[in-house]
Structures are given as C-alpha cells and as structure tokens.
Amino acid sequence: MSCQYQDGKVPKVVKENFNAKYPNENDPDWDIDKNDNFEASFKKDGVHYRADFSPNGNWIETENNIDKKDLPEVIQDIIDTKYEAYKIVEIEEVTHYQKGFFYDVEITKDGNKQDVEFLKSGAIIN
C-alpha cells in the first residue's frame, strides 16, 4: 500500500541519489511504501520502473513488471509444474542492492498470496 507523496517533502538526499542513479530521469512520481521507503515511478525507453530508496537516501531496488512469456523458459516450466494450481498475480524483474538481479513472481491460491523469487537459472532464492 502506498500513497502519493509530494515531491517537495521527499528528502533532498533521496532526490539527489535518485538523480545520480538515473541522471536523465528528472520527473519521477514519488510515493511512500508500507516500509516508509520512497518509491520513484518513472518511464525509461517506454518501460515503467519503480525505484525504492530508504529515507536516508540509500537505493534499495528497482523493479518493472513483465509478462510470463518474458520469463526465462526454465522459470516458466517451474511455474507450470510446481505452481500449476496457483494463479499468477504479478511478475517483476528486480535489481536489488544485496540480491542482485532476480524475478519476483507473486502467486495466489485459496486467497493466500506468496512471492517466489527466481534467479535467471531457475533457482529459487527465498
């Protein structure tokens, strides 16, 4: 759950670090997420991205939504077998400051949501 955040109230260090990481993206929309991190939404090369920064300006992660067909085939196969009874809610490509690049697949079954994080190889990391 996030709420619209006025750009004037985003800490200067957060804006500076966003601008350093994404120098050509000067007009993001800012939200604050459930963890009190600042989320910048912006478009780059026609793709919508969300970049999260802590209140002290540290970059946490950048993510964008993709379709199942855009997942590596090995991950599609795992979803089709191991999670065949689940419905896919959302799929994201994520680059995280600690975990590096991975795919976050949010699935649901009987009202219970869970995230499964995959490396490109298909290894599950959470």
Predicted regions located by residue number:
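Hydrophobic/anchoring residues in structured secondary elements
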Residues: 30-32, 64, 91-93
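Exposed beta-strand-loop-beta-strand "reactive/processing" segments of non-cytosolic proteins
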Residues: 26-50, 99-115
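Bacterial Sec-dependent N-terminal signal peptides
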Residues: 1-10, 18
